[in-house]
Curated annotation (Swiss-Prot):
Assembly mode: Monomer.
GO molecular function: 4 iron, 4 sulfur cluster binding; metal ion binding; N6-isopentenyladenosine methylthiotransferase activity
Localization annotation: Cytoplasm
Cofactor(s), names only, from the UniProt record: [4Fe-4S] cluster
Gene3D superfamilies: Methylthiotransferase, N-terminal domain, tm_1862 like domain
Binding site for [4Fe-4S] cluster 1: 11, 47, 80
Domain TRAM stretches: 375-437
NCBIfam families: miaB-methiolase (TIGR01574), MiaB/RimO family radical SAM methylthiotransferase (TIGR00089)
Keyword set includes Ligase: no
Species, as recorded: Myxococcus xanthus (strain DK1622)
Organism lineage string: Bacteria, Pseudomonadati, Myxococcota, Myxococcia, Myxococcales
Name recorded for this polypeptide: tRNA-2-methylthio-N(6)-dimethylallyladenosine synthase
Amino acid sequence: MKRYFIHTFGCQMNVNDSLRMSEVLSQMSYAPTPVPDNADLIILNTCSIREKAEDKMLSALGRYKPVKASRGALIGVGGCVAQQEKDKLLKKVPYLDFVFGPDNIARLPDIIGRVSAERERVVETAFVNSEEYVFPRADPETSRGKVTEFVTVMKGCDNVCSFCIVPHTRGREVSRAFPDVLVEVADLAKVGVREVTLIGQNVNSYAGGISFAQLLLRTAEVPGIERVRFTTSHPHDLSDELIEAFRVQPKITPHFHLPVQCGSDRILKMMRRDYTVVQYLERLAKLREARPGIAVTTDIIVGFPGETEEEFEMTMQLTEQVRYDNQFSFVYSPRPKTGAALREKDWGPVPHEVKIARLERLQKLQRRISGEITAALVGSEVEVMVEGHSRYDATKRFGRTPENRTVNFDGDAPAGSFVTVKVERATPNQLAGKQVALLKPPTVEPLPVPMAEAPFHVVAEA
């Protein structure tokens, strides 16, 4: 049997796409391998949100070149870099066999067949017409024994933020019909999945026959589902209806990832974000009033063209004011075809060393805030959904709180259980403690394997 290895870069959408790739390959009688040197097929599922991710991809391709020389392995590149660069990648990497975009995962059998039979180098990056697009869905049998799963509800983005390449690599917004979403969720619940994460580039603008708030509420009503998460959201589309859903349905987890990007109204306007800092804070205040204790995380870009020291300080002040539970912060990276990249010289590029210094200051501030938030939980008891053995110590269990905080703990509850854990230690990014009570057993017999890791054939990195 031929074996495959998938190397994933970037966001949860890419992780989900890689899982769908693995299902397609399994149907082709490929088996996964955790060792790329043993693979007959290597796929890099790429991210182009930052230049650094592209550099990592090219570095990884270089590492996999000897596998092609020794085993004759096929090497393909999928994801957003593939969509962006198309046939340029074949010219840049002579040993690359095929390139395919996010819309073309279902065509992998044809692509691989053409490469194998005809030794043809293939590029498939056409966006599928919205009426013809078939959303990837998890195979319930593949998901059997898992306790958490992604469910795609939409793709693409109609916002044109000046820093973002996603509209060019993922296309226009297309929403999945809500009955199809609910059928997939129900199928997953029947095989033991207890938490689903509804994903899309901008889920708040979902338009699959009902509003996104209504979709969340209906998903929470599916028998067997205990937790409903989602990502990613745009502050401009955070509606009162969605906030009310957090108030009335406890299964919608108290965690909201709400990317602010920066703390300056002038920069937000240049970014084309369509909200001000005051408007963002007003939405956030309503959310916290509706769901006290909700964990809020964010994305921040440092060193956007034209950002002054005073404007960076506004971002620092906003971080201190909001007290995010965590944040994903990066230096600005110009992306092809984006408005900011085209106007960077006019707006004034921020020197690299200034970007790095600002990022280090911001991340230091966030580590302090995150540490204060988690330290306050020491001595308390938290609810944890057990996902399996800890990746750090196989004698311990691993899971997450409703607020999406990682917990490693002493206990014996199987994956899929809900337990109470007394928090004994905390770092800015995780909690540790011991199990003190079993709240709910799993709904199906758990698999006798660790669940804390991603599937071993999908190696993910940012």
